[in-house]
Amino acid sequence: QVRKKDSGEIFAMKVLKKDHVVRRNQVEHTMTERRILENIKHPFVVSLRYAFQTTQKLYMVFDFFNGGELFHYLSTGGRFSPERAMFYGAEITMALGHLHSLNIVYRDLKPENLLLDAEGHIKVTDFGLSKQGVVDDNVKSFCGTPEYLAPEILKRETYGKVVDWW
């Protein structure tokens, strides 16, 4: 977390070394993440507040959510009540529905990428693997977190937004 000097506000900051981004062939993914987050305004999607760079690093500044990752709650508590699971499921569904209405496929839905705000609402974060301009089942790239990959991706078939529901 970081603090804005003039206001004292606390934010989360993602710092990427440019040479690391280039070496790992992540330039397009990084640019896509910034482009998407600059334009998305949704209550269940993290907001990009600022983005800047130095000669060696890229910085993306987001609202800070002190509720932590959904993964943490699952790994320490084991499970949610049916009501809480439905509540989170509804918010995730609304976030993905909004992304899909903008022809964005998220491709990395997992508890580690779901943050909780102070009121207990979901915030989808980490758009590094997202893809814009997905109208039909026209995506072929193999990406995502292995434990959460949809069958279409594993089989190296073309796919579309439906993989986000897996």
Tell me what each language-model feature is.
Residues 94-104:
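Protein kinase catalytic-loop region centered on the HRD/HxD motif
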Residues 10, 15-41:
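Conserved N-lobe beta3->alphaC-helix segment of eukaryotic protein kinase catalytic domains
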